[in-house]
Amino acid sequence: MPANYTCTRPDGDNTDFRYFIYAVTYTVILVPGLIGNILALWVFYGYMKETKRAVIFMINLAIADLLQVLSLPLRIFYYLNHDWPFGPGLCMFCFYLKYVNMYASIYFLVCISVRRFWFLMYPFRFHDCKQKYDLYISIAGWLIICLACVLFPLLRTSDDTSGNRTKCFVDLPTRNVNLAQSVVMMTIGELIGFVTPLLIVLYCTWKTVLSLQDKYPMAQDLGEKQKALKMILTCAGVFLICFAPYHFSFPLDFLVKSNEIKSCLARRVILIFHSVALCLASLNSCLDPVIYYFSTNEFRRRLSRQDLHDSIQLHAKSFVSNHTASTMTPELC
């Protein structure tokens, strides 16, 4: 096929394939992501007062993942039925929620890595660091991310329909934007939203690895460093597996949708690659609970059989006690 071949419908042959990938991926993610993140919130709530090691950031990361997971049934419906009957408002909100989840996940993964790194490298300086500061950092992060991600739905339109079919998600048409402005926005977004966070996580990983090379480390200190390194490495792994492919394919996909790339073969390859990258970007919703389990001792302890049994009994006794007290209290007229 000639390189300068222009497609009238470059995605026509790949639409069913891409829809199938999305539907299968989101179905696979849905149940593990829902159960895993609900369990994560329950566990973190239980030991929130016991530790200062980034638990507030982990709670916010689990909330971000849970919001994404709760929108998956609507995405699955669309990709199975090839139509969106729920109105443009809900479509744009779910589309917007995808990016909020992604960049909130990136933000809180960075916060977790930096917090563990600081506790490791400067234990006395940050030993008495109060959780309220982590709460303020989390609130500020949510506000910035929610405002910044408004740009994504603003660059799409929900007015286009094909016959009786209403488009949503990846099929939303892109608004006409000047190419120079698009390049500037994408460059700023890539640098702030991915490159800088990735460099921060890689720096924390590198410095933690160097700290393990001390000639005479104390046994307790060595154990703390190994646990911190495990957590930071898993954060870096999520970045590279889930978010790197998307941030590489996103500018290319934008150029395809803006008709700046004319080669039919190149357009089809980019659309398929971007579809796979989108699926990988959603995978973090069920990967994060696995990370908590394998990199956090408290998480494993809390989910152990005995601790789980004791916690359920404690919650049951608390519920019965509160219910009994409320029924014995006379009603006020």
UniProtKB/Swiss-Prot annotation:
GO terms for biological process: G protein-coupled receptor signaling pathway; negative regulation of interleukin-2 production; T cell homeostasis. One of its GO terms (molecular function) is G protein-coupled receptor activity. The chain crosses the membrane at residues 28-48, 54-74, 92-112, 135-155, 183-203, 232-252, 270-290. PROSITE patterns: G_PROTEIN_RECEP_F1_2. GO terms for cellular component: centriolar satellite; intracellular membrane-bounded organelle; plasma membrane. It is a multi-pass membrane protein. This is Probable G-protein coupled receptor 174.
